[in-house]
Amino acid sequence: QMCIRDRGTGGVSLFALQFAKMVGARAMVISGSEEKMQRARDLGADEVLNYRENPEWGKQVREFSGGEGIDHIVEVGGPETLPQSLRAIRPGGTISMIGVLSGPEMKAQLGLIVTRQVRLQGITVGHRDGFEAMCRGIQASGIKPVVDRVLPFDKLLEAMELLPQGRHFGKICLEF
């Protein structure tokens, strides 16, 4: 099974990359930064793709999969990136929507969703059993979250201002 992280250099996407590699999946990371793509390779990404240089990246992603399409896409971009994810997904594949960085509303491309029988699933915190299973996997594999920086709690406003800039690689954490 192959996974893809869309705009994949934030904390959630990098954690998903680590989980994909833990279970033996081939994984691709899409980013707009050469430096971040190299760091994703260092974390185990099998392939990286620059969405700034390849705005129609769905086609290149299909090539990565041998032309069949990706089994599972972790979609954090939202309406601006979902159309390319729909081009990249294999028939019957799953797109897990875990973020909407480009906004909460879009014109849906129902034709691709229906004809490719795509499973589009929203992801939130989840349930306790899933959380416990995730924790067991983390413990067994030694996965560590990628932390870009840790700020004291009194720098909360600064941390919130850093997030939309997208310059971080991994999580921005607050220390209490």
Stretches with model-predicted labels:
Residues 23, 31-34, 76-149, 153, ...:
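Glycine-rich phosphate-binding loop and adjacent beta-alpha segment
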Residues 68-69, 90:
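Short acidic/histidine-rich motifs immediately flanking catalytic phosphotransfer sites
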Residues 49, 71-74:
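N-terminal Rossmann-like NAD(P) cofactor-binding module of classical short-chain dehydrogenase/reductase
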Residues 45, 69-70, 156:
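Local beta-strand N-terminus motif with an aromatic residue
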Residues 55-67:
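Short amphipathic alpha-helix with an adjacent loop that forms part of the alpha/beta core around
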Residues 67, 142-146, 157-176:
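C-terminal capping/lid region of NAD(P)-dependent oxidoreductase domains
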Residues 1-54:
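Mid-domain Rossmann-like dinucleotide-binding core that forms the NAD(H)/NADP(H) cofactor-binding site
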